Amino acid sequence: MRTFLDVRDSFLEGSDSPRDYLERCLECIDSREPQVKAWVVLNLENARQAADESGKRYRQGKPLSVIDGMPLGSKDVLQTLDMPTELGSPIFKGRETNMDTASVNALRLAGGVILGKTVTTEFAFVKPGPTTNPFDPQATPGGSSSGTSAAVGAGMIPAGWRNQVVGSGIRPASYCGNFAIKPTIGALHNGEGLSLSQLHLGVHAASLPDMWAVAYQIANRAGSDPGYPGLYGPEKMCDPQIPRRLIVLKTEGWDDCDEKTKDAFLELLESLKAQGVKLIHRSDDKSVEHFETSILGSVILCRIICSYEMRWLLRNYKATGLLSEDLKQWLDLAEEMSLQDYREALQKRDEMRKALQALSPLAEGLITLSSPGPAPSLGHLVDSGEPEFAYKTGNPSFNAATSALGLPCITLPLLGIDRMPTGIQLMGQHHTDWNLTGDASWMMQTLKPISA
C-alpha cells in the first residue's frame, strides 16, 4: 500500500513534491483501475492544480497541515463541489449538488487533494457496484465502502473516507487489507447524511498515522455531528502502548467463521498473552457473559433500525421506478413496522450500550475479528437471518454490534487467510479513540502477522 506521512519530509526538503506523489498515484490508477474499478469519477485537472498549490506551500515552508498534498478518495455518498454525487444509484446519475459536505470542506481546508469519488453500493446499502477486490478480482471488496477500501488496498491512494451504519467500513477494510477507524458515534461530522441514528464517518488508510491524521483534520475543521462532543485527542496519534487487559468477544459472528480464520485468531490471542496482555473471556466474568448475550441479534437489529429510519427516503426513491429490488425488499420490511417496533429496537440498543459501559472497569478495550474470514467470491450470498434478502458484499456479523453500540473501533490487517487479508478489530469505550490508536500501534509493532 502507499503511505503519505513518512514521505512528507521530502516535500519540505525539496527532494519530492505533492505533484510528483500524485502522479505516482495516477500511474497506479492507470495500471490497476481497469480491473479493480474503484472509482466513479476522477477530477484530474483539479487534483493536479491542488497538488501544485500544495507544492508552493511546502516550498515556502507553510503547509496547511500534515496532510497538505495528500491524495484522497471520497465515497460517492458525500457531496463534492466539483464532481457529481450519484449515491450508487441511477436515480442520481450525473447529479451536481454544487457544494462540499462538511468532511470534504474540512479536508480541502487542510490541503487535501480530493482526487475523485469512490464506488459505493446503492445508497450505501446492499446492492453491489462494479468494484473488485484488489487482492483477487474474483472476490468482493466488501460494501458499502467498496471503492475506498479497494483504492487504498491497491495502492492507488494513501487514504480515503466513508461512512458506516452496519459494517460498510470495517468489513471492506478487512477484506482489502486496510487500516481503518470507525470513530465514536458522532465524533466526525456526517454533513448532509444525518438521517440515520448510527451513522459513523470514518477513515481508511495505508498506515495508522495516515488514518489518524485524516480523522483529526476532519474533526478539527468540521467538528462533530450536532450535539456530540467530537473526536478527542491531539493531532499526533498516541504513542504505542500495551493494552494490559482486553476482553475477547465472539459475537454472533463466531459461528459464521471458517476454521482457518478461527485458528489464526486464537493463535494471535496466544501471541498477546505471551506479551503479557491479560485476556478476559465470557466464561471469566458474568458482565462479559451478559454483554455477549445482549448483543446477540445485532445484525437484524441494525436492519430494523436503519430501514425504518430510511423508510421515507426509500418511498421517494421507489416512486422514480429506478430503485433496485434489493432496496424495495428493505422498504417492504420497513412498511411492516410500527413506531412501537422502532421504539423497542432503540430500547434494545440502549440496553446494549449500558452493558458496554459496565465492562469499563474490567479492561482497556475489546478485541475480535473484523470479518468472519477473508473476502467471499463476487456474487456470494450471505444469509441475513431474514428470508426476504441476503447480503451480497460479505457478512456484517462482526460489525453490526459495534455500529449499534457507537463505540470506536480500528481494524488491523494482521491475518492472512488463504493468501487474502483479514482484519483484527480493536474496540474501546466511547471517546477512547486516541488511546485506541496507541494500542493498535503497539500491536502492529509487536505482533507477527499470522498466515493460515
Please describe what each predicted stretch is:
Residues 1-48, 274-276, 451-452:
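An N-terminal boundary/leader segment
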Residues 18-23, 52, 259-284, 314-320, ...:
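Acyltransferase
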Residues 25, 69, 75, 109, ...:
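Glycine-rich, small-residue loops and helix-cap segments
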Residues 38, 224-231, 274-287:
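Flexible, glycine/charged-enriched surface loops at secondary-structure junctions
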Residues 67-87, 240-245, 301-353, 411-421:
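Short helix-loop capping/hinge segments that flank enzyme active sites or metal/cofactor-binding pockets
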Residues 99-218, 403, 408-416, 420-423:
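Short glycine/serine-rich loop segments
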Residues 182-266, 447-452:
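A short helix-breaking turn/cap at a secondary-structure junction
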